[in-house]
Amino acid sequence: MKLTAACAAAALCCAAPLPGQAQDGTFASRSLTPETALTAARAALDSCRKAGYQVAVAVVDRAGLVQVLLRDRFAGAHTLDVASNKAWTAASFRTSTATLAAETQAGRPMSGLRALPRFMAAGGGLVIKGGGQVFGAIAVSGAPGGDADERCAAAGIQAIADAIEF
């Protein structure tokens, strides 16, 4: 009986997956805390305010789901949707919306992407990366031109750079 139990235990040990094998079917990811996402959004909004622009800012997670959405008092009503869609686009494609705007011009191989719902081919959306990982994206709408929107979004990322580098 003792020999049978010992053999059964040995067989179970050999049949059980190793810890490294069990992890092959999953992965771990980190997310911005609501506080960190809010810090980025506020920094982007403040950067645009200092430049004299009334804007909306969206921060989304890696799946493109909104974490923070801010609109300055006099930013146009449309800026909320535009910022949210820019952030979704940057997170979804893991690249800046300015890059996508250039790559999806008429006649380019990727021009069909412009027909996707929520796809926003205008500068101002940036991917939030830290420690080799994508956390999501931040986007701004309402400044005069995508370049100005992008500068404000970059200020938002800069404000949280220390918190997301590890």
Give, region by region, the residue ranges found by the protein language model.
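Flexible, solvent-exposed loop/hinge segments and secondary-structure transition points
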Residues: Q21-F166
